[in-house]
């Protein structure tokens, strides 16, 4: 088919489509060419036109595009939450106030709270929207669980209402996409028995491929809650909670948490502390899953397990994780 039937210009054999559209500054001849070589095109990089890009510049451009996409996804998740008035609506806060009473209605303080729930919810909602809310002092007691003594700090039931709204409407939707599937603590639809079944599936997967070869590495983070650095929590709030009012509220919960060491530690028994600490090691979890490529791996609060067919490689991986 000739150039006349396609209504092409008379010099179509000596011009490429890029030069035809004016993308390259000079025509490139393709006549009698067995292989068309790739020629540099114009790129817009940091507000300047480039004909040639080095390898470092291409890597940087790809990184900036990936970074922009990640930031856009974070912004979309924050926009999906809505404004403060929607997140802490009267209907939602009243619903979470009712949930705070489940199982503890025999307490006098809970009965007083539920009896004044209509007016109390409106009062606390106004304080949250005006950024005047401050949590009350927690009740401290010790609990012996399977032979281990744990210090518990129970918040007042009026604060629990706000904690539940903050966790379910803000922290869980924003922290969830950053966590791996095999992180099963304090999440809806998961839990201890779910993790038992997940571990059983992973053991079956390993045995079908490697038999009895390999080993299991168990890790325990000592002083997980008492040693939680507040700086990392504030940094994660800055990265994921893009609404300044919501970020200030989440920072207030951390700042007023009872901890013996300034700038370090979160209390057991406070629901936002559970959500913060469940998502805190997400960077390590994603590194083990994605970078190290460990399929049989799980994380339940401060307990880790890794199943690997090569014992020596598993030891080396354990040192890298630590």
Locate predicted features:
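Non-catalytic, polymerase-adjacent accessory regions of viral genome-replication enzymes
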Residues: 2-122
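Active-site-proximal segment of RNA-dependent polymerases
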Residues: 24, 32, 80-84, 167-219, ...
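Right-hand nucleic-acid polymerase module
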Residues: 36, 41-63, 67, 155, ...
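Glycine-/proline-rich flexible loop or hinge segments
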Residues: 99-111, 143-153, 180-182
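Short coil/turn segments at secondary-structure boundaries
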Residues: 109-113, 136-142, 177-183, 211-218, ...
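Reverse-transcriptase-like RNA-dependent polymerase core
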Residues: 124-148, 245-258
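Conserved pre-motif C helix in the palm subdomain of viral-like polymerases
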Residues: 149-180, 262-290
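Conserved polymerase palm-domain catalytic core
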Residues: 202-301, 305-321
């Amino acid at each position: 088919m000739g150039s006349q039937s396609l209504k092409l210009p008379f010099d179509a054999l000596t011009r490429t489509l890029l030069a035809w559209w004016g993308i390259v500054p000079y025509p490139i001849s393709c006549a009698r060419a067995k292989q068309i070589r790739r020629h540099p095109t114009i790129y817009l990089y940091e507000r300047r036109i480039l004909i040639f890009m080095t390898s470092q510049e291409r890597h940087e451009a790809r990184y900036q595009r990936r970074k922009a996409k990640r930031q856009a996804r974070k912004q979309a998740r924050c926009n999906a939450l809505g404004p403060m008035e929607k997140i802490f609506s009267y209907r939602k806060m009243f619903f979470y106030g009712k949930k705070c009473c489940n199982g503890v209605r025999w307490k006098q303080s809970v009965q007083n709270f539920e009896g004044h729930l209509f007016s109390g919810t409106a009062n606390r909602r106004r304080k949250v929207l005006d950024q005047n809310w401050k949590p009350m002092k927690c009740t401290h007691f010790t609990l012996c669980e399977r032979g281990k003594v744990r210090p518990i700090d129970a918040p007042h039931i009026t604060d629990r209402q706000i904690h539940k709204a903050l966790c379910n409407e803000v922290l869980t939707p924003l922290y969830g996409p950053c966590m791996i599937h095999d992180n099963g603590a304090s999440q809806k639809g998961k839990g201890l028995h779910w993790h038992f079944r997940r571990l059983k599936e992973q053991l079956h997967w390993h045995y079908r491929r490697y038999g009895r070869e390999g080993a299991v590495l168990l890790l325990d983070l000592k002083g997980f809650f008492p040693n939680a650095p507040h700086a990392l929590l504030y940094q994660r709030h800055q990265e994921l909670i893009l609404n300044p009012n919501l970020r200030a509220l989440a920072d207030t919960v951390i700042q007023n948490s009872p901890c013996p060491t300034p700038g370090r530690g979160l209390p057991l028994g406070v629901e936002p502390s559970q959500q913060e600490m469940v998502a805190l090691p997400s960077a390590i979890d994603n590194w083990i899953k994605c970078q190290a490529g460990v399929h049989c791996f799980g994380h339940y609060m401060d307990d880790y397990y890794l199943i690997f067919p090569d014992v020596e490689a598993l030891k080396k991986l354990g040192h890298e994780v630590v």
